[in-house]
């Protein structure tokens, strides 16, 4: 039986990117295509398993594109799909809000 999707747009968005790591993965991919190791290095404290699971979820949701190259050693690259890129203004708003909040805390 298929689970019913939420009707609230905020709930839908939070379901897709509400996880701490997902929003940070999107932040990093907004600067361009990255390999798994590059993402892992830039995300302090994330385990390999958690990064793998988040990337798989984001690929399944249509936010991230995974491209595997038939090379030795194997190479896999991740990039944002159009739906992922559409989150750029959301992250920009978060940056502005975070900067304003930081200033208020001084």
Annotate each predicted stretch with a short phrase:
Residues 54:
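Residues within the DNA-recognition helix of helix-turn-helix
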Residues 70-93:
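Basic, amphipathic "hinge/linker" alpha-helix immediately C-terminal to the N-terminal HTH DNA-binding motif
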Residues 67:
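Conserved catalytic-core motifs of GNAT/GCN5-like acyltransferases
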Residues 8-50, 74-77:
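N-terminal helix-turn-helix DNA-binding core of bacterial DNA-binding proteins
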Residues 5, 9, 86-106:
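Amphipathic alpha-helical dimerization/coiled-coil segments
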């Amino acid at each position: 039986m298929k689970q019913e999707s939420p009707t609230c747009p905020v709930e839908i968005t939070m379901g897709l990117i509400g996880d701490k790591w997902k929003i940070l993965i999107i932040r990093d991919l907004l600067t361009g295509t990255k390999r798994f190791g590059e993402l892992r290095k830039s995300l302090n404290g994330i385990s390999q398993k958690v990064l793998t699971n988040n990337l798989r979820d984001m690929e399944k949701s249509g936010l991230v594109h995974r491209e595997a190259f038939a090379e030795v050693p194997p190479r896999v690259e991740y990039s944002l799909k159009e739906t992922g890129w559409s989150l750029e203004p959301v992250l920009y708003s978060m940056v502005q809000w975070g900067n304003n909040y930081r200033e208020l805390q001084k």
